[in-house]
């Protein structure tokens, strides 16, 4: 969506691909899906991914190659969920993110507990622009509570949000020390 709540398609950025791949690898995420159905955007993602997986970047920066091992490009949310179901042998819990709360909002602590204690896989979806439509979001099991900073401003880049959320869900439990 855009700021007028119109359905749009946002552009993939090189930085988002890199930074989310690196954060996902740091937090031992099994699979990072880039979901896009526009051919020109898919081509951009494929170019970036192949540069780091098999191209010059794979030998120039082997750490970056490692970060791209678990990156997959798919056409739709449904395709990503189907791939996880096939790989894991069961349907995942699907949780999305938003800067607003909903009836099915879940806390970080609750989702972290599910990740640690349940065998069922979890898919966490992130949107770009002004997020996904309300209708799309209502199709999922949960919506993670918003990230609240110290002030009133609440519009993070997707790569910032991914890093913060991965740390809350998969990072060291420093508060237990």
What positions do the PLM features span?
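Conserved acidic residues
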Residues: 30, 92, 121-122, 141
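Short, glycine/charged-enriched secondary-structure capping and boundary segments
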Residues: 47-49, 108-112, 138-141, 159
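RNA substrate-binding interface of SAM-dependent RNA methyltransferases
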Residues: 1-99, 163-176
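Secondary-structure boundary/capping motif
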Residues: 41-44, 103-104, 132, 153-154
């Amino acid at each position: 969506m855009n700021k007028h709540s119109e359905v749009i398609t946002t552009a993939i950025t090189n930085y988002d691909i890199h930074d989310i791949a690196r954060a996902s690898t740091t937090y031992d995420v099994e699979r990072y899906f880039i979901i896009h159905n526009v051919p020109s955007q898919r081509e951009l993602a494929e170019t970036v991914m192949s540069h780091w997986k098999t191209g010059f970047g794979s030998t120039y920066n082997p750490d970056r190659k490692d970060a791209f091992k678990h990156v997959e490009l798919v056409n739709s949310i449904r395709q990503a969920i189907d791939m996880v179901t096939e790989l894991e042998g069961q349907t995942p819990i699907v949780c999305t993110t938003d800067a607003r709360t909903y009836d099915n909002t879940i806390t970080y602590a609750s989702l972290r507990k599910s990740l640690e204690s349940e065998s069922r896989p979890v898919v966490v979806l992130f949107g770009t622009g002004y997020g996904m439509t309300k209708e799309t979001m209502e199709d999922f099991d949960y919506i993670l509570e918003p990230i609240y900073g110290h002030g009133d401003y609440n519009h993070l880049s997707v790569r910032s949000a991914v890093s913060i959320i991965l740390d809350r869900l998969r990072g060291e439990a420093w508060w237990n020390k």
